[in-house]
Amino acid sequence: MQKLAIVGGGISGLSLAYYLQNDYEITVFEKDKWGGKAYTQKVGNYLFEEGVNGFLNNSPKTLELCEKIGIKPIKADENAKIRYIYDDKLIKLPSKPVEFLTSDIMSLKGKIRILKEFFIKPVCEREESVKEFAIRRLGKEFYRKMMIPMLAGIYASTPEITSMNAAFPKLKKIECEYGSLFKGLNKLKRGGEPTGELHSFEYGMSEFINKLKEKTKANFVIKEIKDVDELKDFDKIVIATEAYSASEILKKYEKLSDLLKKIPYNPVAIVGLDFESITPKSFGILTIKNKTLGILMDKYIFPNRNGIRAMLGGARYSEIKDLNEEEIIKTALDDIYEIIKNANPKITWLKLHKNAIPNYSLSHQKLVEDIFTEAEKFNIYLTGNAYNGISFNDCIKNSFELAERLKK
Ligand SMILES: Cc1cc2nc3c(=O)[nH]c(=O)nc-3n(C[C@H](O)[C@H](O)[C@H](O)COP(=O)(O)OP(=O)(O)OC[C@H]3O[C@@H](n4cnc5c(N)ncnc54)[C@H](O)[C@@H]3O)c2cc1C
């Protein structure tokens, strides 16, 4: 049997090892924690996710993997359907797009502008930023009130530095196929509502990671790989790390290494907290201009969580990575007091990811194409959230597809 080295024990590396366990003799190298950004920290009675909060149940590959390894995801509480944005005051988000027209989230002028979306010509021949796309199709007010918080919540980024084509390829495709988002979503009978429901596991994402490892026949080694030459004994190599780590490991291939370095990352600090009483009972709150990008009301979403988490920084406030623990917690507490009027936490917990999430910047798709073409020249394979999809679901799907290629 051929020997395969997988560098990186996040969901991308681990799911790849699972899919290929009967085809290769596999060794997975991880420098830190199994699960990478999918890691649950237990602090007394509290479970705090260091990264991934959950996943939508609209990706067949993730659900299939859960079934194969024998773990049952749990659905988020009904409260998770209630979401807010904070724009000097808390505003409840409509749960269905039609409710936009009756809610007070947008001015009358803003609502009329949204309806004009039906008649805006599509732009398909060139790439656009999320900002350009949103203002062009839905207007400035929608852009400010919806896209700024959404980008912070999903990508820890800002719409002006994010590529619409790379970050939301499905929406871009709908625009180009149907001429308008509303026409397309209507034809697809989606009505613009989310296509899946949020799920996680009873004891957090680490429960899944541990089970996945348990069901995978591979050598799991805690070791930082500093140079690809350390893997000379293997027939095939997959790098499933962050792009900047891949760049370092592959430094001997200068052009490939330089291309990988071009994928920027945004920092995120996560502060776990609990207070005597917390409202609103909901999934959470996204902000438009605070240093805290959002507050996740974990205790109202999944069992055993008990606390809440504030997510700070991102591209909006990248200085977060240079603050010390005390300063980060103070920043979170100031925002929490402003937004939900809570003070004097019973507990505080902090995780700082200096390089949390890759930014899908303008030209990201071309950059990824160049990276993959260059890597293939050296028989090196890459997978992970830096390339073709940022979500937990995307990582599993992409590793499945790579596994199918490596089986051939
Ligand atoms: C704060 C935060 C919240 C998120 N929330 C969600 C969410 O709710 N839902 C969702 O779908 N997605 C979420 N994501 C995105 C999600 O984390 C990722 O898409 C996915 O978990 C990434 O998995 P990965 O295996 O590609 O990368 P990672 O999890 O980053 O794994 C890469 C691994 O490689 C290891 N490594 C790096 N260099 C080396 C080396 N030289 N040698 C050995 N090992 C090395 C690292 O230690 C790490 O474990 C979130 C991300 C963050 C940061």
What are these regions (language model features)?
Residues 12, 34, 244:
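Conserved Rossmann-like nucleotide-cofactor binding loop
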Residues 223-326, 334-339, 372:
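Mid-domain catalytic core of redox enzymes
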Residues 44-122:
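Dinucleotide-binding Rossmann-like beta1-alpha1 core, especially the glycine-rich loop
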Residues 30, 75-78, 220-227, 384:
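Short loop/edge segments at beta-strand edges and connector loops
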Residues 40, 94-98, 298-408:
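Conserved flavin/dinucleotide-binding core of flavoenzymes
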Residues 21-43:
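Glycine-rich FAD pyrophosphate-binding loop
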Residues 2-28:
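N-terminal Rossmann-like FAD-binding beta1-loop-alpha1 element of flavoenzymes
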Residues 89, 114-226, 231-233:
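Active-site/ligand-binding neighborhood in enzyme catalytic cores
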